[in-house]
Amino acid sequence: MSSFQGQMAEYPTISIDRFDRENLKARAYFLSHCHKDHMKGLRAPSLKRRLECSLKVFLYCSPVTKELLLTSPKYRFWENRIITIEIETPTQISLVDEASGEKEEVVVTLLPAGHCPGSVMFLFQGSNGTVLYTGDFRLAKGEASRMELLHSGGRVKDIQSVYLDTTFCDPRFYQIPSREQCLRGILELVRSWVTRSPHHVVWLNCKAAYGYEYLFTNLSEELGVQVHVDKLDMFKNMPDILHHLTTDRNTQIHACRHPKAEECFQWNKLPCGITSQNKTALHTISIKPSTMWFGERTRKTNVIVRTGESSYRACFSFHSSFSEIKDFLSYICPVNVYPNVIPVGLTVDKVMDVLKPLCRSPQSVEPKYKPLGKLKRARTIHLDSEEDDDLFDDPLPTPLRHKVPYQLTLQPELFSMKALPLDQPELRQSPGGCKAESVWSPSLANFIDCEESNSDSGEELETPPPSLQGGLGPSTLVQQNADPDVDIPQWEVFFKRRDEITGECLEHLPSSIETGGSQSPKLCSDSPKLCSDSPKLCSDSDGDSTHISSQNSSQSTHITDQGSQGWDSQCDTVLLSSQEKSGGDSTSLNKGAYKPKLKESISASQIEQDALCPQDTHCDLKSRAEVNGAPCLVELDTLSGRKSPPEKTLLSSTRADSQSSSDFEIPSTPEAELPTPEHLQCLYRKLATGQSIVVEKRKCSLLDS
């Protein structure tokens, strides 16, 4: 029994299968089929008056429903107000408010419902979305997928709401035999009975005026016997049905009905009261198609069940089973669902608990039509109001510039890449020569920006000539002991380093150090003091300064390493002081006599200071005139062993050349002469006895040996 009130939330100006109360104000009426529970108020006087006062109110239904409706004289007043719509034919109708003239366009499509002759479902498409009203329906599993008008673009239409027939939305009716199964069971029973003799008859006890036409026509076609009914006028325009029915009582299959429920002839079970012509008693059985009775059974039964001596029950349903309802709704997958019928013993809430999980979420934003496939979208991030500070904690969207650490560590080992703990304040020394190991220790505190990029294709490292390698001996040759599997360090390792030279390295210091590429040649200070407040250690304007030249590569020790063949540049590791020191003498060092011992271990606090040498440093160096002839000399301030505090270490800001261009090279001093060993004997003696060599008191230090 339908409990639908007639109006849909999406289109309230339309009334379906209900024609009383609020539905009297509707702009259009729709009738799904001609069963009485769907025709309330259809012939009421109030509706008749509404039709008399309106010229644009019509009733829309299928052609079969119109024929069945107009067979009754009670509904003849609708004859000029009924508009038929063909099945599966989308039709646009106008909903007009006669008082205001407002008009609304809606497209209506009728779909077969399988409930009874002429029964349809209504699919409405308009400005308020797509809505499906099923009325009473019986659709087998998978039948909805074969309805083309429920689909668009190869997928189910986006249906907002479904007003669903839930007559058997109860687990008790989980599985109902199909009509074909029921037909086969009834057919076998009827055939076995009527073939016994002409006096064996069957009465089909059908409660509805029509709806069992499917059963009648198939029995008549299979057995060749027409079915007796009370009236044929309702089927006069349905020749396919009319051919299998008759009003002649002299037939073996009857579907006639009693004039009243209580009237039944005591001596005859047939409502029509037919008897045999030769006074022979008729042998009659009754078959009652029903569904509710089978739903009340606790055990599985057959399609046909004998309930008495001559009575049978047949499972035959006009409505979809519980499993068929779920299959249909899960396939349509609407946003909302509304039950049209409340099953016996259930409530609306219990029915909704079953139906709601089969619907899709209204918050779903997935596009229904994706002809180009799934496209990429920007990710949506919902920020919590309590975590607003996270907006400023994220990394910048622009790429960061390269960072070069201030502090690098060089150990007196052969040049090979090796990890060095940061907590070692001093480096080991080699008695046979100054062996240096390049170690990259990234600073965790201070970095400087690398303002230039270095192209790998723009420069190549030079290799020392064979003659030079043979002359230096094993103590001076570069050892290629780097592990080739170790990751090649970045070229930033050799930029902006602070180099310290201990006193005993002066014994093995060469006259010049060859740079592997065109590095920064400006290692001399513009200030008269080496440890001035200015962080610069180089100047092109200092004409008296001694330079490290890459032009005299034959007189310098080439530093190379197998593991660093891909390095873009190398950095000079000797710091030079200015010749312009007040009261100090400069002494040139002989070529090839000494090798530098390099040390660099600068903490973050030391970087902030401009101190390179201890305050009590003394030095006896030769005068400036004695060193003018050297082609490529290294001028150093030899320092005492007292260490200055870490806070007073010079901030080395020597800028390394990353472009390998000859424009940055500084030639050696013109007309310079190499110093002879006799000039340096005084210095050697002081170094051998451990005496302090004082040049000037400064706030810088190089560690003693």
Curated annotation (Swiss-Prot):
Residues 451-462 have a biased composition (Acidic residues). The keyword ATP-binding does not apply. One of its GO terms (molecular function) is single-stranded DNA endodeoxyribonuclease activity. Its EC number is 3.1.-.-. SUPFAM superfamilies: Metallo-hydrolase/oxidoreductase. Its main location: nucleus. Residues 560-569 have a biased composition (Polar residues). Phosphorylation on undefined residues by PRKDC may stimulate endonucleolytic activity on 5' and 3' hairpins and overhangs. PRKDC must remain present, even after phosphorylation, for efficient hairpin opening. Also phosphorylated by ATM in response to ionizing radiation (IR) and by ATR in response to ultraviolet (UV) radiation. It holds the Pfam family DRMBL. It comes from the Eukaryota. Keywords: Adaptive immunity, DNA damage, DNA recombination, DNA repair, Endonuclease, Exonuclease, Hydrolase, Immunity, Magnesium, Nuclease, Nucleus, Phosphoprotein, SCID. One of its GO terms (cellular component) is nucleus. This is Protein artemis.
